[in-house]
Regions:
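Conserved short hydrophobic interaction patches
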Residues: 13-16, 62, 66, 115
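Structured adenosyl-cofactor binding patch, chiefly the S-adenosyl-L-methionine
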Residues: 81, 85-126
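S-adenosyl-L-methionine/SAH cofactor-binding core of RNA-modifying enzymes
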Residues: 20-74
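Short histidine/acidic/glycine/proline-rich micro-motifs that form metal-
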Residues: 1-4, 50, 98
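Rossmann-fold NAD(P)-binding glycine/threonine-rich loop
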Residues: 78
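N-terminal beta1-alpha1 ligand-phosphate binding loop
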Residues: 1-17
Length: 126
């Protein structure tokens, strides 16, 4: 469960993202139930320290490529002990440091918002 102080930040970025993308946050407590909640036609990105690290501009290009493919984009953040997800299409790293999974959610949402602002040519990214 998401706890303060992260709740306010998550809600803030969900509101900001609403005009750019459909965002649905789903919490699953048990690792074995994660795969069942991923849409069938989804491009699934597992957040993993060993994944691809993007700067914000490259991440915005990644988002645009996924949008053009017509597939749903699904990001999966594991719990405190990580997550094995054999069906994941791609792995993304938010950086080399370990983050609490609740903070990782905030960072991911902020980067999604930043990426959409970059794609729209709107001021935010600097």
């Amino acid at each position: 469960r998401l706890r303060p102080p992260y709740v306010d930040d998550v809600q803030h970025y969900q509101r900001l993202l609403a005009r750019h993308a459909r965002v649905e946050l789903i919490e699953v407590r048990e690792d074995d139930k994660v795969a069942a909640r991923i849409p069938e036609r989804a491009y699934t990105c597992l957040l993993d320290a060993e994944g691809t690290a993007y700067d914000s501009v490259a991440f915005s290009r990644f988002l645009e490529e996924r949008r053009m493919s017509g597939m749903d984009l699904c990001f999966v953040i594991g719990g405190p002990y990580g997550l094995e997800l054999p069906g994941a299409t791609h792995a993304i790293s938010l950086g080399p440091m370990t983050l609490p999974h609740q903070l990782a959610r905030v960072v991911l949402l902020e980067q999604l918002y930043r990426g959409h602002k970059i794609l729209a040519g709107e001021p935010y990214h600097n």
